[in-house]
Amino acid sequence: MTSPIVAVSSAPSPDPRFLALGAGRYQVHGSEGPLRSETVVPADPRAPALARSVLDNEMASALLPRIADSKVVLSEVVANAVQHGTVNGRGNIRLVVDLDSERLHVRVEQELSAASVRPSYSPLPHPGGFGLRIVEALADDWGAEPGPPGCVWFQIEA
């Protein structure tokens, strides 16, 4: 049985400061700025594609100049969360995407700690280990927060 995408909103429904924009999206009431999307995806091989669809469906028009970079970085961070941030590839990954007129900020929260997240610079050829080097090259800023839940975040200027 496959797990569906589950969208969640962190905005409490009775709070009048937030205007609901659909499942998992909200915006400060009366403004055109910052947009937040919170989504939970299953920690399985589909997770990077599901995460990219969040950017496609929710925020692509605001990120036109850097949407490709944003999707590549998101794919790498989510793939790392599936591979290294879950127990035997089971569980969920939570995406928190904040977008305003100046930047995209994404948090990818995983079940295990993210304390040892760093790019690999091994001189020996190996089949992987380039994901965080790609993140470092394309994101304007990125980092990790220990957990659990652990979090890897990145920021891309719009």
Spans of model-derived segments:
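Conserved short strand/loop->alpha-helix "switch" segment adjacent to the catalytic nucleotide/phosphoryl-transfer site
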Residues: 52-75, 124
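STAS-typified acidic loop motif
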Residues: 38-48
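Conserved beta-strand-loop-beta-strand hairpin that lines the nucleotide-binding pocket
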Residues: 1-38, 82-158
